[in-house]
Every structure is written in C-alpha cells, then in structure tokens.
Amino acid sequence: MTVLRTRSAVQHARELNNFLSCAAPLSLRSHSRPISGFNRPPPNYPGHVPLNFVERGALAVGSAVGALLNPRRADLIAACGEATATPYFIYRLRDAMLSDPTGRQILRDRPRITSETLKLPYLRSLPENTVGRTYATWLDREGVSPDTRDNVQYIDDEECAYVMQRYRECHDFYHAVTGLPIFVEGELALKAFEFLNTLIPMTGLSLFASVRLKPAERERLFSIYLPWALRSGLRSKELINVYWEKVLEKDVGELREELGIERPPDMREIRRMIRMQKKREKELMEQRGQ
C-alpha cells in the first residue's frame, strides 16, 4: 500500500498504546491482579511492547480495518504486519534465513538500512544499471527516504523482531528492482509478490484494499500485475536472504535473473499512455463538436 512516511514514531506509539489500553474489557482493567491469561508479560528488548492475547487480537483487527479504510496509514500497516505475523509466519521467515548462508550472515551482522548506512550520494554516483543507482533513482523519483520505517514493537522474540525489521527496511529495494511505484496500485502489486515470497499475512491481506481502486486500475491489477506476482513470487528466491548492502554495485538485470524476478510492465508508463490516449480522444470529440 502507499505509505504516509511523515508520521512520527512517537505519535504512532502513543495512538496504538491508547487504542490497546481501551481494547481490554473494563472488568479486566479494573482488577488489580487480572487473571494470568490476560497479563502483559515483561519486554524482551528495548522498545518492545509485549501484548497479551486480547490486546494482540484487538491490534490485529483494529489495525487491519483502519489500514483498509486508509491505505496511507503506514503505522497501521506496520502494526497489522506485526500482530498477524506470529505465532508461525515470522518464525518461518527466520528459519528461512537460518537455512541460508547469506541469511545467517545477515542475522549475525544485523545491518540496518538508512540513508547514512547506504551513503545515498555514493549510490547516485554509481553506473546507471547498478542495484545501488537503481535504488537511489527510485527513492528520488518517488520522493521517499529509507529513514522513515517504524521500529518493530509487537513481536515478542528478539531475533524475529529483527527479521521483521529487516523485511520492512528491504521493502524499498523490492520496489526498486521491480520498478513498481508507491501509489496504491503499485503497492498492491508488490504486496501480492511479497506474500508469495514471504508468506507474511499482512501482505496478502493488503489485497482487500483493491476494492478502493478505480475500475480501470483494478482491472489492470488483476489482468497484468497479479499474474506477474504469481509467476515471480512462486519462482523467486527468498528475498529476505539478499544482503542488499553487498550487491549495490551489481548489475540490476543480472540480480533479477539470479533471484528469478521478472520485471513487470512499467506501471507509470502505462498510466501515462492511458492519460495521453484519453486526452487525444477528448480533443477529437471537441473538434467534431465544433
């Protein structure tokens, strides 16, 4: 989905914590010692917000509905991703990293993707066909930054929390190598691909937002981009195991081939051509009416 990248993390945490504090029934909140099944466990790492069963369920449902109503709410999308990734899916992704040499190295090194760690001015100076230049060009074209990803809060296992953080910070690389833009139609196409590659539930649930697309956009999504996502998502390697920081100088076409990713049709170009066609048709209609 298209993300609104300017929401502060502090505001995000405050809103979600207020929501969770209201989610539990009053009868449970009024007891000084609630029954153990509803106790909130202690945090496992800095910034961790442990949730009990009721809170996790409320967060999953509330954030999913809120994100569907407003696909630009990046904070709700992130919360939904964390709340629905456990108990199975994030562990499966972690195990995929543990079973791969590069994945294990990433888990040992725990790199973070920011404009400082990637040195964006350097990436802009790389040859045009490199992964790093493609990534920097995509960031500049879409007007986004790698510095605005929320930190993971609601995943209990500390190692799995890093896996989710890594997925979140690598998301823009997936955009860059596929060329998909950040408006809703492009995000949904990428989320479909990500679901088949990662099995993270939030990525699949995102497709419900297709009901908010215009008819032409929805038809294009289902006829062009979902078939592409199916082909590429099922045959591509686990993208979580790509050490992006080490392939920045690699040819992007060569990397796509190695990963098994087919580049989809240029969505921006398709939309531009449709606009031009409609403009010409309108001009012809006006000329005939004179």
From Swiss-Prot:
Its EC number is 4.1.1.130. Component of a multi-subunit COQ enzyme complex, composed of at least coq3, coq4, coq5, coq6, coq7 and coq9. HAMAP family: Coq4. Lyase that catalyzes the C1-decarboxylation of 4-hydroxy-3-methoxy-5-(all-trans-polyprenyl)benzoic acid into 2-methoxy-6-(all-trans-polyprenyl)phenol during ubiquinone biosynthesis. Keywords: Lyase, Membrane, Metal-binding, Mitochondrion, Mitochondrion inner membrane, Transit peptide, Ubiquinone biosynthesis, Zinc. Its main location: mitochondrion. It is found in: Mitochondrion inner membrane. It comes from the Eukaryota. It is a peripheral membrane protein. Belongs to the COQ4 family. GO terms for cellular component: extrinsic component of mitochondrial inner membrane. Residues 1-7 form a transit peptide. It is an enzyme of class 4 (lyase). Zn(2+) binds at residues 171-172, 175, 187. This is Ubiquinone biosynthesis protein coq4, mitochondrial.
